[in-house]
Amino acid sequence: SEEIPARMQKRAAAEFSQIFTSELEKVGLAYETANYFVTPRRITISIDGLPLQQATVVEERRGPRVDAPAPALDGFMRSNNISRDQIEERETKKGRFYFVEIETKGKLTKEVLPAIIETSLKKFAWPKSMRWGSNSFRWVRPLHSILAVFEAEVLHGELDLGHDKLVFTNMTKGHRCCGAEKISVANFADY
């Protein structure tokens, strides 16, 4: 972005990191460490130990009673997209019910991260913010780029600014006065 006011920098980096890690936890992505850094023109988050894929989740769903009318069982199977052979009967304190276990395979982390980045940016609230151009997105100063890399690959995503879109990239710029050339980033060491 352009110059972030000095009084806002440290708090902004800490808060943004907290929002981002909270979003990771919501989608079941565990991580080892999360570090944040701030400069007058950047907020940086580095997450170590992210898995390559979300964990597979097995959810148990209780259906109708065993003695319920057939349409109730048909509706349960249709709503869960299952067949009769996937259902089992179990005894509970309230009687005998049909149950099914639904297994949801985890998505690749690189497919989940772009939405987390966009959500985190939109959730973050600055004490004072602005819009620029004909965009509706608000930030402390105009955003120029979003560097987003996972496992040496650019994440395929974008931030919808309202009128324009800011596509994620693996490029950043050096110091604006002493070397503003573009720098390609594949990992945190490159950054």
Regions flagged by a language model, labelled:
Residues 1-191:
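Long, basic N-terminal domains or extensions that often function
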